[in-house]
Amino acid sequence: MTRIDLNSDLGESFGRYTIGNDDQVLDLITAANVACGFHAGDPDVMAQTVALAETKGVAIGAHPGFPDLGGFGRRKLDMTPAEVKNMVTYQVSALMGFTKDHRLHHVKPHGALYNAAAKDLALARAICEGVAQVDDQLPLYGLAGSQLLEAAKEVGLPAYSEVFADRGYQADGSLVPRSQPNAVLTDPLAVAERALSMVQTQSVTAVTGETVPLKVDTICVHGDNQAALALVDQLRQTFTANGITIQAC
């Protein structure tokens, strides 16, 4: 039986600013990547999001990012490996403190940190070492085929291969930058059919037409996407209709 995890980046509101449809999205996903206050979120939002996820039985993961609130963590900052390691440990520990049993299901880096670590092994290793300082058995979610997954293997962390239902792919398996056309997909039916194909064929078609092989353990739909709720709902319907069980990794 085929099983797939559906995850979403949540807890990204802060102060008086509300981002996303967290309450509704949590009814449809199996794992939540919760912002840890650096790129988005704040202590109150972190506490509220964790409590809500626990109530709904959704697996909770830390979503650390660069300290870039103004840029939503989508700008790469020049930091040493030691700084990245400590930054990740800090954020993961902070979110863990809000959980009932002080345990997390996984860690998934955010935005520019995630994308840079997909290609930069030294940066990826620093992230994994930061996670391991908190819990050396805490699983990592990383882009399929990326250096982040390779670093997790080197450091000894469990890892799951992630794909994106609502993002365009380049021929090398990286995501199309948000500044370019076809970077973000919003049509629920098209996204669901594409995701189903990814699961069934373990591959994706790049925006330039190439077939890119990838391993699919978990699928991300972005919570800050205006179509997020409709996308996740359609994904569930499509997977269920095709005999795919939706379950956290």
UniProtKB/Swiss-Prot annotation:
<comment type="similarity">
    <text>Belongs to the LamB/PxpA family.</text>
</comment>
<comment type="function">
    <text>Catalyzes the cleavage of 5-oxoproline to form L-glutamate coupled to the hydrolysis of ATP to ADP and inorganic phosphate.</text>
</comment>
<keyword id="KW-0067">ATP-binding</keyword>
<comment type="subunit">
    <text>Forms a complex composed of PxpA, PxpB and PxpC.</text>
</comment>
<dbReference type="GO" id="GO:0005524">
    <property type="term" value="F:ATP binding"/>
</dbReference>
<dbReference type="InterPro" id="IPR011330">
    <property type="entry name" value="Glyco_hydro/deAcase_b/a-brl"/>
</dbReference>
<dbReference type="Pfam" id="PF03746">
    <property type="entry name" value="LamB_YcsF"/>
</dbReference>
<dbReference type="GO" id="GO:0005975">
    <property type="term" value="P:carbohydrate metabolic process"/>
</dbReference>
<keyword id="KW-0378">Hydrolase</keyword>
<dbReference type="InterPro" id="IPR005501">
    <property type="entry name" value="LamB/YcsF/PxpA-like"/>
</dbReference>
<dbReference type="GO" id="GO:0017168">
    <property type="term" value="F:5-oxoprolinase (ATP-hydrolyzing) activity"/>
</dbReference>
<protein>
    <recommendedName>
        <fullName>5-oxoprolinase subunit A</fullName>
        <ecNumber>3.5.2.9</ecNumber>
    </recommendedName>
</protein>
<keyword id="KW-0547">Nucleotide-binding</keyword>
